[in-house]
């Protein structure tokens, strides 16, 4: 078996992530129902606010909290109440303190893969926040390197290829996000393993595209043992 370099995503690939954000959003929307807007409209405004704030403030709980606050203040206007802002702050603190919930089959699959391939954890987000998740996950020992980046695009993967001297024919990206994990990796000339997650963040969804490498679609992380 050829030794490959596997770049592996973290959030919603190794551990649950977006389900906790979704629970927070549902609670947030409930808090705003008294304003008279539909739940769908509140979510639409929140999504638009997140897209805007990500460009300026990046990813992570702090940016998310800002988006919740901005959405509330926009919709409430002069009727904004301090106790709602305080509740948003409380929800953000609770969200950031949530420990990683490792997905089924991940530890034993990583242990197997680490014996045969070079594993690099590639995750995006606020550096300190993501580093804390990695440490609390207890999975760091399976990886030859851990890379935390602010964004995942084709340029990011090109840098990874150069930094780690990855031979493209033996380089793979493994993840759940078409927008951040799969499409840009393929465009950079790597192959990719798409493992869909039922709760993938709305802003990470897009159509799968073709690229320079091969695309493998699996239903679970443990299936990697069959192919690698």
List where the protein language model places each region.
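Long amphipathic N-terminal alpha/beta scaffold segment
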Residues: 87-107
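A metal-dependent, Asp-based hydrolase signature
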Residues: 49-94
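Conserved phosphate-coupling serine/threonine residues in phosphotransfer and NTP-handling enzymes
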Residues: 123
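Short, surface-exposed acidic
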Residues: 33-48, 77-88, 142
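An amphipathic alpha-helix signature
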Residues: 21-29, 65, 69, 127
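Asp-based, Mg2+/Mn2+-dependent phosphohydrolase catalytic module
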Residues: 1-4, 83, 107, 111, ...
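Structured helix-beta-strand junction loops
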Residues: 98, 115-116
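Active-site neighborhood of HAD-like aspartate-dependent phosphohydrolases
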Residues: 1-45
């Amino acid at each position: 078996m050829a030794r490959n370099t596997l770049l592996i995503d973290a959030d919603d690939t190794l551990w649950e992530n977006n389900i906790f954000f979704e629970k927070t959003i549902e609670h947030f929307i409930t808090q705003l129902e008294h304003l008279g807007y539909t739940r769908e409209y509140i979510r639409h405004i929140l999504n638009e606010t997140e897209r805007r704030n990500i460009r300026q403030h990046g990813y992570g709980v702090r940016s998310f909290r800002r988006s919740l606050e901005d959405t509330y203040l926009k919709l409430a206007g002069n009727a904004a109440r301090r106790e709602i802002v305080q509740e948003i702050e409380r929800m953000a603190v609770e969200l950031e303190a949530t420990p990683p919930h490792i997905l089924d089959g991940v530890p034993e699959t990583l242990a197997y893969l680490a014996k045969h391939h070079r594993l690099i954890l590639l995750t995006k987000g606020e550096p300190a926040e993501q580093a804390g998740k990695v440490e609390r996950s207890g999975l760091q020992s399976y990886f030859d390197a851990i890379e935390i980046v602010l964004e995942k695009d084709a340029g990011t993967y090109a840098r990874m290829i150069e930094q780690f001297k990855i031979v493209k024919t033996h380089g793979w990206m493994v993840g759940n996000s078409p927008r951040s994990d799969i499409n840009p990796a393929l465009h950079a000339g790597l192959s990719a393993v798409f493992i869909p997650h039922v709760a993938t963040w709305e802003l990470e969804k897009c159509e799968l595209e073709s690229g320079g490498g091969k695309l493998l679609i699996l239903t679970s992380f443990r299936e990697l043992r069959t192919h690698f």
